[in-house]
């Protein structure tokens, strides 16, 4: 690649830019002279310190040490995972140039949108082609087909010569979307960027990325779509919000996708800071599954003692004998691991294991469940989003745990009934007493079904 292919649309540290110099024909110039020719800004300004990459201003999120020259040096802790942004150094930021319009459509997807999907898709395209590109919120229930819903927008932006990024806070979501996006736009070379990915950055028309990787982007995209916008870590990260803002070109279109908008998004909608398009029904026209609630007593105490208490044991035996892949959600990692260990002798005919966010074999285990090599996966909330399994059965143990919010309960429940040939399934919430989040989730699931029914979007009552 040429030097500009590495730098365009990016915000890089001095160390990263020096690596570009080493690996390109820029080596023909003196490093200092070449660096001085590039547009740049201070990596940190202050004190009080402000990070030029992520916008961090929290004095607790900076670290000062004594450099080799005896002078104090400060760096940002908020975006440290992508390399140090340090005082006395510079950031090199270059906007991406305009892209080239395409002569023919890059969309190879042969599917068909439902009328309600098509209506929202058309509104997004009209917003892109209009004079005022106000931020858009697509509030579509789990299983509504929100990824396919944005295909016409992607097609139009790409045809017009724009660059598009579909970003998500979760690696699992990116890995779920990657094959679908590549199949839908088979003529384009779509790059997938996340920590540890095989793809390296190039200036391409279509990018799939984690929101963390956007910390390296600068005015790179004409259209930026953030999927699962209410998910951790994006939802609570000022740095990632800043990364999204900076990655979008001036005048670009920002679209948020979620099934469970948080209070901030709803407030922005009510205040007119964004436009909301709501889709309260799944693509197959069946209602969202509602949970069966079951009191199971003090199961954490039993688990800590190395046993499954009788009510829980009986329920999990029944759950294990259900057809199809099974997800057993457990609030905390030690509980998930202990539960999987106790389930193996209880359900000897099943292939099962546990999984969590820091599990190095996480992707292998998810793939094994997809392929039928695993029957049951005991999981934390890491699989509440971005995993679509036909005929999936779900049991949420400790549904009343304070870790579980209204949104997380709805997302976990949303793994059930996503396929048209089996639009329902087991959805069990096991608890020691109903929590406020449980009541809120049940209320919203019911309200969404009622809205869908009132709009004539459901095929069944």
Protein language model features and the residues they cover:
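Conserved strand-helix element at the start of the C-terminal RecA-like helicase core
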Residues: 137-147, 157, 162-177, 315-344
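Interdomain "pre-motor" coupling segment immediately N-terminal to P-loop NTPase/helicase cores
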Residues: 39-100
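Conserved segment of the helicase C-terminal RecA-like domain
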Residues: 249-264, 413-444
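Conserved interdomain linker/interface between the two RecA-like ATPase lobes of SF2 helicase motors
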Residues: 138, 273-340, 350-352
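Post-DEXD/H (motif II) to motif III coupling segment of the RecA-like Helicase ATP-binding lobe
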Residues: 219-297
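Conserved helicase motor
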Residues: 168-176, 180-182, 190-202, 209-216, ...
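A short beta-strand element within the Helicase C-terminal
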Residues: 221-227, 376, 384-400, 410, ...
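Conserved SF2 helicase motif VI
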Residues: 235-249, 402-425
């Amino acid at each position: 690649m040429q030097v500009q292919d590495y730098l365009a649309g990016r915000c890089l540290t001095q160390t990263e830019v020096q690596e570009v110099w080493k690996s390109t024909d820029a080596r023909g110039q003196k490093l200092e002279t070449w660096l001085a020719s590039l547009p740049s800004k201070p990596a940190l300004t202050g004190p009080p310190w402000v990070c030029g990459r992520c916008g961090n201003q929290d004095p607790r999120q900076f670290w000062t040490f004594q450099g080799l020259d005896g002078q104090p040096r400060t760096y940002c802790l908020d975006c440290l995972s992508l390399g140090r942004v340090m005082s006395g150094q510079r950031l090199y930021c270059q906007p991406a140039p305009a892209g080239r319009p395409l002569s023919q459509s890059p969309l190879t997807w042969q599917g068909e949108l439902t009328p309600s999907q098509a209506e929202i898709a058309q509104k997004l395209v009209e917003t892109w082609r209009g004079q005022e590109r106000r931020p858009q919120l697509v509030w579509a229930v789990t299983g509504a087909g929100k990824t396919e819903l944005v295909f016409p927008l992607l097609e139009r932006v790409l045809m017009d010569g724009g660059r598009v990024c579909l970003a998500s806070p979760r690696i699992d979501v990116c890995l779920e979307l990657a094959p679908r996006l590549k199949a839908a736009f088979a003529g384009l070379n779509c790059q997938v960027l996340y920590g540890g990915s095989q793809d390296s950055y190039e200036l391409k028309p279509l990018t799939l990325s984690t929101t963390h990787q956007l910390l390296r982007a600068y005015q790179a995209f004409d259209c930026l779509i953030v999927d699962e916008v209410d998910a951790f870590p994006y939802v609570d990260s000022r740095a990632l919000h800043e990364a999204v803002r900076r990655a979008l070109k001036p005048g670009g279109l920002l679209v948020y996708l979620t099934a469970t908008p948080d209070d901030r998004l709803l407030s922005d909608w009510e205040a007119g800071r964004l436009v909301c398009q709501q889709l309260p029904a799944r693509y197959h026209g069946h209602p969202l599954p509602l949970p069966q609630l079951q009191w199971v007593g003090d199961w954490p105490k039993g688990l800590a003692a190395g046993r499954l208490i009788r009510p829980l044991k009986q329920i999990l035996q029944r759950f294990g004998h259900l057809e199809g892949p099974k997800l057993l959600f457990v609030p905390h990692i030690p509980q998930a691991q202990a539960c999987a260990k106790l389930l193996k002798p209880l359900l000897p005919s099943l292939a099962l294991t546990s999984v969590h966010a820091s599990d190095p074999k996480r992707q292998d285990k998810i793939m094994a469940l997809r392929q039928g090599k695993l029957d049951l996966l005991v999981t934390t909330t890491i699989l509440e989003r971005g995993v679509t399994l036909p005929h999936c059965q779900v049991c949420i143990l400790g549904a009343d745990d304070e870790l579980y919010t209204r949104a997380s309960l709805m997302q976990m429940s949303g793994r059930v009934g996503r396929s048209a040939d089996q639009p329902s399934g087991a959805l069990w919430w096991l608890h020691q007493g109903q929590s406020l989040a449980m009541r809120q989730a049940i209320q919203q699931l019911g309200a969404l079904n009622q809205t869908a029914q009132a709009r004539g979007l459901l095929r069944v009552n």
